């Protein structure tokens, strides 16, 4: 909001939706990762793909989505925000791109060893219940590839009402 016009408002509404779905998926996956590793410290969580592949995949997909990689919905919303910024406030575009780059590097640096790092732990005999993680990620992926017309209409109406 504040970037200018209905397209920016539409992008902001879409971003709030996909970002919150992605973040909740990451929180669910991180909770399972902490239970799997027996610690809440990120430094103590390593090699999730080897120990619990479903937790590892859930965390990795959530991280890729929150980083704004295509085809996830966060990419679509950030793309709309950046294109609106380029049109309405060209000076803000480099700042946004740098901020996205810093966020990308920081998140990737922390998540990569959690998912792919070396571990002494043995694989778990069972997989935790990760339905919420993969449901949210599937919704974010869907919104990156296809927006249901009813949802697009609702966002357009809300964007116009916002200003």
Feature annotation, model-predicted:
Residues 3-10, 68-80, 145-152:
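Transmembrane helix-loop junctions in multi-pass membrane proteins
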Residues 22-94, 121-140:
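Interfacial and helix-entry/exit segments of alpha-helical transmembrane bundles
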């Amino acid at each position: 909001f504040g970037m200018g016009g209905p397209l920016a408002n539409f992008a902001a509404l879409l971003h709030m939706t996909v970002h919150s779905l992605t973040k909740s998926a990451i929180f669910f996956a991180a909770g399972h990762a902490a239970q799997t590793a027996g610690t809440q410290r990120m430094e103590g969580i390593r090699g999730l793909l080897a120990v619990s592949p479903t937790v590892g995949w859930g965390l990795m997909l959530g991280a890729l989505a929150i980083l704004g990689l295509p085809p996830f919905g966060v990419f679509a919303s950030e793309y709309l925000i950046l294109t609106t910024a380029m049109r309405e406030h060209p000076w803000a575009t480099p700042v946004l791109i740098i901020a996205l780059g810093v966020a990308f590097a920081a998140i990737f640096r922390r998540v990569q060893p959690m998912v792919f790092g070396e571990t002494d732990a043995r694989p778990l005999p069972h997989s935790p219940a990760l339905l919420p993680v993969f449901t949210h990620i599937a919704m974010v992926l869907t919104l990156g590839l296809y927006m249901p017309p009813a949802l697009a209409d609702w966002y357009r109406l809300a964007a116009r009402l916002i200003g």
